[in-house]
Amino acid sequence: MPKKDRAQEAPSRDVPKPEEGQTICVVKKMLGGDHLVVLCMDGKERLARIPGKIRKKMWMREGDVVLVGIWDFQPNRCDILYKYGNDEIKRLVNENIISREVIDQLRG
């Protein structure tokens, strides 16, 4: 007897939102190794580092939207904390955390 067709729903996860010392950025250039140049919402270009625990799990490309944690002692450097997917970017736009124009402008 065949199984009944069940509606497949993707589990909805909470989208990480920027907290104190964090900002949303767009990957501008890959430098090699685990370093990237990112353009942040505050208009600054920062040198970002992919930490070891997410280096092999999360592949980066130019134009990806990421959440970064800014270093306290060097504000022009940061660590990648999370990479947003397309559906998560739409959810951020719907919640008015970031505007679509800003994303389009940062992606250039």
UniProtKB/Swiss-Prot annotation:
PROSITE patterns reported in the protein's UniProt record: IF1A, S1_IF1_TYPE
Molecular function GO labels: RNA binding; translation initiation factor activity
SMART domains in the cross-refs: eIF1a (SM00652)
Domain of life: Archaea
Leader peptide range in chain numbering: none
Pfam family, one: eIF-1a
Keywords, comma-separated and alphabetical: Initiation factor, Protein biosynthesis
Domain S1-like residues, every copy: 11-85
Disulfide partners: none
SUPFAM superfamilies per record: Nucleic acid-binding proteins
Job description of the protein: Seems to be required for maximal rate of protein biosynthesis. Enhances ribosome dissociation into subunits and stabilizes the binding of the initiator Met-tRNA(I) to 40 S ribosomal subunits.
Family: Belongs to the eIF-1A family.
Protein name: Translation initiation factor 1A
Organism: Saccharolobus islandicus (strain L.S.2.15 / Lassen #1)
